[in-house]
């Protein structure tokens, strides 16, 4: 592992009177840091989907463009799996900004004439972007685990999870604004979001801290007196990547069940997300501004949808998450079918996209 990514060493404890105010301040600070940082990742994740209608106009085949955009998802899945182990052995303060920096720089290159010159170059750059995107979630999860205790983590995680919808919602309007400012669809869809993402890199690095112990604070379990089952001092020892991978990932059957189920959800989520711009432009005749706001609606609707899903599963179905998921998925299938077969007006298009976004996340 690169030495500069190693977790910061534990520091001696601060004086007792400083621990509580420092802990409270840093908990808010690191949460804002990973929220803004992860939202920044989504400014440079799906830009290619917004560019596809223009690439089709340039003469590129839609099927080949589909192959190119699939590289992003393939690389993202592999990276999230493999880089998660690397992240567990790295400083979150460095790992998250590094991945966002590499994603933004690759997005800048993708927006150049050379980057968009062939399907091969687009495939390679999309693969790299997907790989670097896999460096966003794992360090955020590391921060959540170290700074928030077991019985508060669910609420904090659900709030933080909104970050990717915020970033995903902003990319559509941002592309429209960038195109209006710079007079180029390449600038609107690639360069402008990438430059903003690089600014977010600085903010994330300044705000995020790796662990409480690296700041002279006790473990979060000790601070809040909130210990998970079988907790011991050994729980705070940094494991090797091999131990994490073989002991806690490969042998976890429930994790595999969830992963397989999630793969089918992603077929719909990214199928709509990746192809909506091309579909709306070619079939519905939307311009970039209308596409941008449709994109915004899809992502933004996920925020209340996610919150309502949690409330429904907790309060109505008493923690039986599978029932809530089944209801949501049946409703998704209905609205996707309506969107595909019966949506004939911009209003109906918007209603369907909002409903799908509300339900799919």
Region spans (language model):
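C-terminal ends and interior cores of transmembrane alpha-helices
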Residues: 101-116, 330-344
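C-terminal transmembrane helical hairpin of 12-TM major facilitator-type secondary transporters
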Residues: 319-361
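Helix-to-loop junctions at the C-terminal end of transmembrane segments
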Residues: 80-91, 307-318
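Cytoplasmic helix-loop-helix junction between adjacent transmembrane helices
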Residues: 125-165
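Extracytoplasmic gate region of multi-pass secondary transporters
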Residues: 48-50, 252-307
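Helix-loop-helix hairpin linking two adjacent transmembrane segments in secondary transporters
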Residues: 160-213
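Residue-level signature of mid-helix packing/kink "hotspots" within the transmembrane helices
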Residues: 46, 73-81, 168-169, 299-307
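Cytoplasmic membrane-interface "Motif A"-like loop-to-helix N-cap segments
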Residues: 89-100, 315-329
């Amino acid at each position: 592992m690169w030495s500069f990514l190693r977790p910061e060493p534990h520091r001696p404890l601060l004086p007792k009177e400083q621990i509580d105010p420092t802990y409270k301040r840093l908990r808010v600070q690191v949460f804002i840091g990973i929220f803004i940082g992860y939202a920044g990742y989504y400014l440079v994740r799906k830009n290619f989907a917004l560019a596809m209608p223009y690439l089709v106009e340039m003469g590129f085949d839609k099927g080949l463009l589909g192959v190119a955009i699939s590289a992003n998802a393939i690389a993202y899945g592999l990276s999230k799996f493999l880089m998660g182990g690397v992240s567990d052995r790295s400083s979150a303060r460095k790992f998250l900004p590094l991945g966002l920096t590499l994603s933004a720089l690759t997005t800048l290159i993708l927006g150049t004439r050379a980057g968009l010159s062939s399907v091969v170059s687009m495939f390679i750059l999309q693969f790299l972007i997907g790989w670097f995107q896999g460096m966003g979630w794992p360090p955020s999860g590391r921060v959540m685990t170290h700074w928030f205790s077991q019985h508060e983590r669910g609420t904090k995680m659900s709030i933080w999870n909104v970050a990717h919808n915020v970033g995903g919602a902003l990319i559509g309007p941002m592309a429209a604004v960038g195109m209006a400012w710079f007079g180029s669809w390449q600038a609107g869809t690639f360069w402008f979001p990438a430059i903003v993402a690089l600014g977010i890199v600085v903010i994330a690095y300044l705000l995020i801290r790796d662990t409480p112990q690296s700041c002279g604070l006790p473990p979060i379990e000790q601070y809040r007196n909130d210990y998970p089952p079988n907790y011991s001092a050994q729980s705070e020892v940094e494991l090797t990547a091999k131990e994490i991978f073989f002991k806690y990932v490969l042998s976890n059957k429930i994790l595999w069940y969830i992963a397989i189920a999630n793969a089918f959800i992603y077929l719909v989520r990214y199928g709509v997300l990746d192809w909506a711009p091309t579909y709306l432009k070619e079939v519905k005749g939307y311009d970039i501004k209308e596409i941008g706001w449709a994109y915004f609606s899809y992502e933004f609707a996920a925020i209340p949808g996610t919150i309502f899903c949690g409330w429904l599963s907790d309060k109505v179905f008493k923690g039986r998450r599978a029932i809530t998921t089944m209801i949501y998925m049946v409703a998704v299938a209905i609205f996707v079918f309506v969107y595909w077969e019966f949506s004939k007006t911009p209003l109906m298009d918007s209603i369907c996209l909002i409903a799908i976004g509300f339900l799919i996340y």
